[in-house]
Curated annotation (Swiss-Prot):
Gene responsible for this protein: atpI
HAMAP family the UniProt entry points to: ATP_synth_a_bact
Organism from which the protein derives: Glycine max (Soybean)
Membrane-topology annotation of the record: Multi-pass membrane protein
Protein's UniProt name: ATP synthase subunit a, chloroplastic
InterPro entries assigned: ATP_syn_F0_a_bact/chloroplast, ATP_synth_F0_asu, ATP_synth_F0_asu_AS, F0_ATP_A_sf
Length: 247
């Protein structure tokens, strides 16, 4: 009997873990529309962190940089290198866009692990990292799509559309489909990795709430940074591709 009760309790615990979900949505009702307030609030927090950090650094620039200025200069140099490698010699105007994507995604991903969002009490639902919501990642992917369309059209004009029938008109449907798969792959890759990371941490904390989840959390911080780099690199590559016309 004791063995049976133990087995039932174990199965019940596993069932509870299988139902784990990361966060509940917090909505604002605006007319007949429901807005994901969770995403807006946490995105504003991330944007505020970036703006405040930038203002504090640039208001007192020095010839011999201190730690903060030196760190930001290193980040800027890194983003320039990524942009130049993927876009080419005309990378200059696109550094702010690529840098904004990278920093926003990077800080958003890390905020999910480092900021105690769940401490903030809401009427219903709870806060989580912005990139933990598919709406954020799809919006970032659509911005990237608009950017590479603009890059191609601004450089080549209507001749940009010749790429859809190169090297042969038979590939027209595939080339059109590619414009839909690019934002889909960008958005779902980022969303899936961040969501999976948070789910793994939640499940491990439920099973072993002490030391074991800590290495996984550090691994999550590393993969979060890698995901930000991948997104920014692919965005720059798509922009460079649209300007050069290569597939």
């Amino acid at each position: 009997m004791n063995v049976l009760l133990c087995s039932i309790n174990t199965l019940k615990r596993l069932y509870d873990i299988s139902a784990v979900e990361v966060g509940q949505h917090f909505y604002w009702q605006i007319g007949s529309f429901q807005v994901h307030a969770q995403v807006l609030i946490t995105s504003w927090v991330v944007i505020a962190l970036l703006l405040v950090s930038a203002i504090l650094i640039i208001r007192n620039l020095q010839t011999i940089p201190a730690f903060g200025q030196n760190f930001f200069e290193y980040v800027l140099e890194f983003i320039r290198d990524v942009s130049k490698t993927q876009i080419g010699e005309e990378y200059g105007p696109w550094v702010p866009f690529i840098g904004t994507l990278f920093l926003f995604i990077f800080v958003s991903n890390w905020s999910g692990a480092l900021l105690p969002w769940k401490i903030i009490q809401l009427p219903h639902g709870e806060l989580a990292a912005p990139t933990n919501d598919i709406n954020t990642t799809v919006a970032l992917a659509l911005l990237t799509s608009i950017a590479y369309f603009y890059a191609g059209l601004s450089k080549k004009g209507l001749a940009y559309f010749n790429k859809y029938i190169q090297p042969t008109p038979i590939l027209l449907p595939i080339n059109i489909l590619e414009d839909f798969t690019k934002p889909l792959s960008l958005s779902f890759r980022l969303f899936g990795n961040i969501l999976a990371d948070e789910l793994v941490v939640v499940v491990l904390v439920s099973l072993v709430p002490l030391v074991v989840p800590i290495p996984v959390m550090f691994l999550g911080l590393f993969t979060s940074g890698i995901q930000a780099l991948i997104f920014a690199t692919l965005a720059a590559a798509y922009i460079g591709e649209s300007m050069e016309g290569h597939h």
